[in-house]
Amino acid sequence: MNYLIRDATIVNENKIFQSDVLIKDGRIEKIVTHINLKYSIKEIDATGLYLFPGAIDDQVHFREPGLTHKATIYTESKAAVAGGVTSFMEMPNTQPPAFTQQLLEDKYNIAKHTSLANYSFFMGTSNDNYDEVMRCNEKRKDICGIKIFMGSSTGNLLVDNPLALDKIFSNSELLIATHCEDEKIIKENFAKLKAEKGVLEPSDHPVIRNEEACFESSFRAVQYAKKYGSRLHILHISTEKELQLFTNIIPLKEKKITAEVCVHHLHFTSDDYERLGNLIKCNPAIKSPNNKAALWNALLDDRLDVIATDHAPHTWKEKNEPYEKAHAGLPLVQHSLMLMLHYYKEGKITLEKIAEKMSHAVATCFEIEDRGFIREGYYADLVLVDLHKPVTVNKENILYKCGWSPLENFTFPASVTHSFINGNLIYENGVFDESYKGMRLKFSR
């Protein structure tokens, strides 16, 4: 169906302006102050609403295949769409992990039939699947990137063989995304704390997975990338010390090394373990208020390039085990845009910066074709937001399959009212049209 969005306040490419938007055959046909048509069309009255490019989340864990008691591509993509996330890139630590081209394509096939949002999937790496990883080079336009766990996390896909890392960094033609935490430091910290305390608790998590563990691993990844001229993207930066590894003196398009920050590291601090315990246990750990403040500064001055969620759902039971057994990760994809709009209302970030870090910059970093901007000719991945319609997170409106959120009872000052994906109105004021499915993302490489 074609649509005419009337009188929207558009937030795009560092500008805010009033305009109509004509959507035709899945793409943005026209952006003009007032559009007069000689034929009938479905109109959306956007008076008083803000139109954003759909958010693109470059790091989610949707748990399919193999872990579908936690989540599925269908359930989590539905939650994403309700929150204004119109495209996602999913990580390889499913069961089995995406270690072969066939296993990777199996995930694409699931998404083709079930995902309400647009999608791409990272190829997984291990110490011994180099040949399969290199086959991604010929598919560079069809795969978002290669994921390397340089520290162990959920799924234990740790790559710790220097020869394997050397070969991948030297020969991959795709973006390499890394989870950076130093395994040796983590194990030493754990053993020391365990010997001292006996029983560990959630507040010990940032002591075990500390600043030094993050910095040493990120530093090592940067050294590999500089040695071989690799395209490196370090995920979920969580410490002030790591920020020295990144620059803001060149345009994003020219950067070979980029960095992501996640909404939970911008929102929570180590002070919140007392209240939320294992619910905010994640890797890398949520750390001190000083680290949070440094991350905000780096985001706003462009040393940190994109905002993501690292959406990682687990069941309530899995999160409420004793600390050592409790699973790491938290569900966030439904609430990331609204959380950033909360910080807009708090005066922390502008609307233009939100659009940049959650849409424009992600599209630029990954060279995504025809998405991430409100431009004529681009796919109509668009989100309407009511900045004056508060919503409180509760069990009734949480769409994650796991059924909980660390933000439960938090009231956002704004709501997502409409989500268009490929020109289709998939979400409107709590109602979904599931007759349309998302598309596989393509990349201009």
PLM regions with names:
Residues 35-51:
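Active-site metal-binding motif and surrounding structural segment of the metallo-beta-lactamase
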Residues 8, 322-325, 376-442:
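C-terminal cap of metal-dependent C-N hydrolases
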Residues 200-220, 224-229, 279, 300-307, ...:
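His/Asp/Glu-enriched, well-ordered alpha-helical/loop segment
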